[in-house]
From Swiss-Prot:
GO terms for biological process: outer dynein arm assembly. One of its GO terms (molecular function) is dynein complex binding. GO terms for cellular component: cytoplasm; dynein axonemal particle. Residues 166-175, 435-444 have a biased composition (Polar residues). It comes from Macaca fascicularis (Crab-eating macaque). Keywords: Cytoplasm, Phosphoprotein. This is Dynein axonemal assembly factor 8. Residues 112-215, 228-267, 344-380, 395-444, 461-535 are annotated as: Disordered.
Length: 535
């Protein structure tokens, strides 16, 4: 390197040196204050012009091994070149016949003198190791930034010794071949008692102590807890101590476990048992809690049973309600089309209820004309929802209307013709007070209106003709002209007035007169039924 430096440095007699004279003086004055590019070689012995970072040879870029090779006289020569080992997978055998050393390099840097062919590898390593044996037979050769372990192996009891870690060594049982032979069985063991390795393996001793403490903690705190929880359900019925059987099971499992298995076997076995026992343990613990809390368990069972019964009742009730609605619709249509001889049987359900209420109130003396419209209006408010049975949009269950239906039918069978006339008179007063505007304001669909008109027309055709002396408006029209005319002429006049009023009552509803032959008492009775508009 000195020759290269001298060749690269300019000579003093050259014209280049004369031109750089002032710059050299400036450099000398400022050099002490400028930081060096290479801190280790800032004050170099080679001269001012040497910059070791740029003038270094390519072979010098290998990590500096001067500290490791300073004590070795054979390796003290700095002109020795280094090369990487040709075989990285196989360890290098470098030792004598008594103690053979193995160097595992990944990747290792060994001198070129030692990197020879595999055929005469053992002889060359023996010669080199014999020269180094007097110096330090147990010291390994290390490289900066890489870990290389020399593993000593004797003929009788060979061992692999780790230099840096110093805690692990692999014992080879009864095999004279190399340790990487598949027939050689390696087992984990500790290397202790080497006084030279004690200062270097101080960290390994601490690690070993930490591992032992951790293993003890796992065995005491975790394994015993797992086995105790697993054995708890089995011994809960007996009521004895739970920990004793668990420890017995744990000791038995350890005794049955072969010696070749690692010490981490018990946790795996206990975890496998825990997976099998988890569900049973949860069920038994819940059963024990329910027994301790008293009647909570049966209560929950009863609640679940009641809930099932409620569900069983509510699910068919919806179907039953729908079937009742369909059956009611069918009966209403059959009643409208069939020939009925009594008014309460022909009227729908809400009109039956209204008629029954009006009949009950009309039985009292002096209440023939006054309470009729009021009761009709009250019933109209109570039975307001339109098209309940036609569109099957029922807001109130039909069970509430069944008593009224039965009461209406009983009254219809037991009432006399005089009560029928009183009901017709009360309905006539209500029909006269009602206006077409009030009927049009009610919320009903077009379909419901058409069905109402069709039902009213069919009922008007099916109703029989009543006698002349029992006309619908006879007694009511008789009151205003009571003092003006005689008996026979007055009856005939009342018949004509009743016919005119029935015709006027049919016209505002938009029903054509051609559908009916002539204004008959039956048609007048049909017009006197306000609840028909509410269906």
């Amino acid at each position: 390197m000195a020759s290269n430096d001298e060749g690269m440095a300019p000579s003093l007699g050259s014209p280049w040196a004369s031109q750089t004279g002032p710059w050299d003086a400036i450099l000398k004055a400022v050099k002490d204050q400028l930081p060096s590019l290479d801190s280790d070689s800032s004050l170099s012995d080679y001269g001012e012009e040497e910059l070791s970072i740029f003038q270094r040879n390519q072979t010098a870029l290998i990590p500096d091994l001067s500290e490791e090779l300073a004590e070795d006289p054979a390796d003290g020569d700095k002109s020795r070149t280094w090369a990487a080992a040709a075989e990285e997978s196989l360890p290098e055998v470098c030792g004598t016949q008594k103690s053979v050393r193995l160097c595992v390099c990944n990747p290792a840097l060994v001198p070129a003198e030692l990197a020879t062919e595999p055929g005469n590898r053992r002889n060359t390593r023996t010669k080199d190791a014999s020269s180094q044996e007097g110096r330090d037979p147990g010291r390994p050769v290390e490289t900066s930034g890489e870990v290389s372990a020399f593993l000593g192996m004797a003929e009788e009891t060979p061992r692999w010794l780790g230099s840096d870690l110093g805690s692990l060594s692999f014992n080879t049982k009864g095999s004279q071949g190399p340790p990487w032979d598949p027939q050689a069985k390696a087992s984990l063991s500790r290397h202790e008692g080497d006084p030279k390795a004690e200062p270097a393996s101080q960290e390994s001793v601490n690690r070993r102590a930490l591992r032992q403490e951790r293993r003890k903690m796992i065995e005491k705190d975790i394994l015993q807890k797992v086995t105790r929880d697993a054995c708890g359900p089995a011994s809960s019925d007996q009521g004895g101590v739970k920990e004793a059987p668990c420890h017995a099971v744990e000791s038995a499992a350890r005794s049955k476990m072969p010696l070749a298995e690692p010490p981490e076997g018990p946790p795996v076995l206990s975890l496998q048992q825990l997976e099998a026992w988890d569900l049973d343990y949860i069920l038994q613990s819940l059963a024990g809690q329910e027994d301790n809390q008293g009647n909570r368990g049966p209560g929950t069972v009863w609640w679940a049973a009641d809930r099932r019964q409620v569900q069983d009742r509510t699910v068919p009730s919806a179907d039953d309600r729908l079937m009742e609605q369909l059956a009611l619709l069918c009966t209403m249509q059959s009643r409208a089309s069939a020939c009925a001889w009594k008014v309460p049987a022909d009227t729908p359900q809400d009109t039956e209820e209204a008629g029954a209420g009006s009949r009950c109130s009309s039985r009292k003396p002096g209440s023939e004309a006054g309470p009729g419209p009021q009761l009709a209006q009250g019933m109209r408010l109570n039975t307001e929802p339109p098209t309940i049975f036609i569109d099957l949009r029922q807001t109130v269950p039909p069970d509430h209307l069944s008593p009224a239906r039965s009461r209406g039918s009983s009254h219809s069978s037991s009432d006399s013709e005089e009560e029928e006339e009183e009901v017709e008179m009360a309905a006539l007063g209500d029909a006269e007070g009602a206006s077409p505007s009030s009927l049009g304001l009610r919320s009903c669909t077009g379909k419901s209106q058409l069905l109402q008109q069709l039902r009213a027309f069919r009922k008007g055709i099916a109703q029989p003709k009543l006698p002349a002396n029992k006309g619908p408006g006879g007694e009511r029209a008789q009151a205003p002209e009571d003092t003006a005319a005689s008996g026979t002429v007055r009856k005939q006049h009342m018949k004509l007035c009743a016919k005119g009023q029935s015709a006027q009552a049919r016209l505002p509803r938009g029903r054509p007169r051609a559908l009916g032959d002539a204004p008959e008492p039956g048609a007048a009775r049909e017009a006197l039924m306000p609840p028909l508009d509410q269906l």
